[in-house]
């Protein structure tokens, strides 16, 4: 446990995570100072009187006088003010680093471009099914510092690349990078390898590394070692087995669960289940209760969620597909009896959309492209694409065209912030319109 007594601590970024950092230091007898580039950041009204605050910009004077800077994942380490502080030898950490220095129970750590919230939640459910007192959070749900509890027997953390950049004391009992595809390229000017390097920090001092056999970018930098356990579609220690028209989860040659017993559907969810099982096994959770959790878990909202099935048409909300890799995962192995009506669009965060093209062949695909990067997406297959300003216009356009056997899929491959508050609002709007139009 670290000692922060007498330290000049500055926290950048408020919100729930920033407040959890403030509470963390106050509980240890240290009064931090807080700054946020927003004029009225969320949580400002909950800040105790004694805490000095500076809003609307960063305060370089405070930063250069600090002994310790706790930076929100929302601010890039490359920001000139942080860069100058780092050059001056000032320590910069994030809330996850503070958490790792204090946590007394083992940590299962999960990152990846896609699937991480589902896998994090699943491992948490597996622990609960085993009667283990578990804390689940990080980049999903509660900030990590709010989970700290002497009674906790296991922590399961979802970690973003931004959080990992400021974390060096993570010693996970089991850690995984589920996949690495282009995302946040606006934060990583040196491209995919720079983004991957941030993700790879999760393996440092991990007891077991769970890697994706189908994605070489998830391997440790020196390649697989004795700490590595793998999962994949057709290969890996944990893989899928197809026999007589049925699909099984298989571990080292042994069939452990028929996927028809699971409530989750889709090949990407079956591989998520394999990854979760590998992590749970590595953390020492009993296999039987982990498999039971797999049969009861219904999935998370906005992640390939069937919001309406009516007149033979399935309306699926995959609004959490905020990058190309996530939409690829939804389309890979997708079975549609009739026509796929695919809604794409939003803010593509400078990504290359071309990997989607291979899934959009054939006569039974229609594209409806909207938002900031709609024109670029429509160019993937212009002869079957319609361009509208908004998602609502796209849905009103496609609704009269759907036939029994068709699927309407919102898997936008883009962030939502050009037209929505967040992906949840976009997904809720899709669900509302599906119920109205379907």
UniProtKB/Swiss-Prot annotation:
Protein keywords: ATP-binding, Cell cycle, Cell division, Cell shape, Cell wall biogenesis/degradation, Cytoplasm, Ligase, Nucleotide-binding, Peptidoglycan synthesis
Enzyme Commission numbers on file: 6.3.2.9
EC class name: ligase
Domain of life of the source: Bacteria
InterPro entries for the chain: Mur-like_cat_sf, Mur_ligase_C, Mur_ligase_C_dom_sf, Mur_ligase_cen, MurD
One Pfam match: Mur_ligase_M
Coiled-coil residue windows: none
UniProt protein name: UDP-N-acetylmuramoylalanine--D-glutamate ligase
Protein's organism: Shigella dysenteriae serotype 1 (strain Sd197)
């Amino acid at each position: 446990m670290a000692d922060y007594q007498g330290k000049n601590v500055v926290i950048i970024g408020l919100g729930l995570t920033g407040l959890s950092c403030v509470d963390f230091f106050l509980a240890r007898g240290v009064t931090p100072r807080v700054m946020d580039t927003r004029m009225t950041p969320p949580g400002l009204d909950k800040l105790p009187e004694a805490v000095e605050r500076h809003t609307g910009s960063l305060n370089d004077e405070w930063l250069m006088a600090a002994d310790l800077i706790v930076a929100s994942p929302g601010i890039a380490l490359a920001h000139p003010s942080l860069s100058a502080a780092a050059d001056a030898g000032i320590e910069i950490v994030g809330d996850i680093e503070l958490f790792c220095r204090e946590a007394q129970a083992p940590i299962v750590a999960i990152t990846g471009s896609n699937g991480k919230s589902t896998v994090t939640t699943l491992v948490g459910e597996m622990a609960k099914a085993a009667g283990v007192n578990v804390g689940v959070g990080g980049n999903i749900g509660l900030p990590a510092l709010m989970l700290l509890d002497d009674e906790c027997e296991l922590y399961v953390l979802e970690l973003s690349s931004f959080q990992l950049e400021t974390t060096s004391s993570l010693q996970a009992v089991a850690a995984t990078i589920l996949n690495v595809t282009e995302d946040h390229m606006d934060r990583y000017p040196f491209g995919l390898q720079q983004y991957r390097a941030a993700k790879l920090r999760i393996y440092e001092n991990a007891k077991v590394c769970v890697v994706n056999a189908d994605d070489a970018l998830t391997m440790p930098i020196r390649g697989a070692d004795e700490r590595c356990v793998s999962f994949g579609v057709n290969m890996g220690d944990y893989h899928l087995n197809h026999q007589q028209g049925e699909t099984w989860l298989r571990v080292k040659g042994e069939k452990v669960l028929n996927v028809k017993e699971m409530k989750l559907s889709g090949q990407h969810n079956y591989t998520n289940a394999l990854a979760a099982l590998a992590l749970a096994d590595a953390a020492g959770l009993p296999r039987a209760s982990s498999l039971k959790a797999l049969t009861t878990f219904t999935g998370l909202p906005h992640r390939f969620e069937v919001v309406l099935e009516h007149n033979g048409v399935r309306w699926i909300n995959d609004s959490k597909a905020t990058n190309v890799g996530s939409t690829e995962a939804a389309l890979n192995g997708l079975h549609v009896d009739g026509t796929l009506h695919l809604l794409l669009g939003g803010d593509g965060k400078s990504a290359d959309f071309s990997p989607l093209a291979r899934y959009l062949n054939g006569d039974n695909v229609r594209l409806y492209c909207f938002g900031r990067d709609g024109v670029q997406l429509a160019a993937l297959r212009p002869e079957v694409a319609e361009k509208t300003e908004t998602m609502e216009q796209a849905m009103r356009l496609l609704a009269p065209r759907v036939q029994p056997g068709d699927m309407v899929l919102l898997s936008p491959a883009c962030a939502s912030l050009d037209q929505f508050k967040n992906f949840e609002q976009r997904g809720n709007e899709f669900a509302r319109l599906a119920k109205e139009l379907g």
